[in-house]
């Protein structure tokens, strides 16, 4: 399997907030839940889950928003939804794939909450779930992604 070509950088729409990823991702995913649809103003949100110790904000000072149980971070200038820190999962950060400077390689490996999604909006993800998989299942998914997931 090819190397990850790290580090990656990315930014918001206006360029005021920038991020850097220095460790390989754990997983790529599309979430079809109603919350992600509303937050992204799209059929689903596309994320790259990265280890928290391989993620940093290198410019700007993101603000919290979006409400709900997850902690969503936005650029304070253009309000681009940049990343999420799910509570209880302090080891990871869900980076919104489109904020990466080089993001066209991202293919969702997992899609979640398909029962809430548009019937026409399915992805090529090899693993699809009507809701959120149980926590025990994520270890198997991340191990599979490490060998089978798309690379830049």
Identify the role of each PLM range.
Residues 1-152:
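A short Gly-Trp-Pro
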């Amino acid at each position: 399997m090819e190397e990850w070509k790290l580090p990656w950088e990315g930014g918001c729409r206006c360029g005021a907030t920038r991020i850097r990823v220095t460790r390989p991702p754990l997983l790529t995913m599309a979430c079809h839940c109603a919350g992600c649809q509303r937050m992204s103003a799209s059929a689903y949100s596309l994320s790259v889950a990265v280890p928290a110790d391989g993620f940093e904000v290198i410019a700007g000072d993101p603000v919290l928003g979006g409400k709900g149980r997850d902690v969503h971070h936005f650029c304070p200038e253009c309000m681009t939804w940049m990343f999420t820190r799910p509570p209880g999962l302090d080891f990871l950060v869900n980076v919104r794939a489109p904020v990466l400077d080089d993001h066209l390689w991202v293919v969702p490996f997992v899609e979640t909450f398909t029962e809430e999604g548009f019937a026409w909006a399915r992805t090529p993800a090899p693993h699809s779930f009507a809701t959120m998989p149980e926590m025990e299942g994520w270890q198997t998914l991340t191990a599979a992604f490490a060998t089978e997931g798309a690379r830049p």
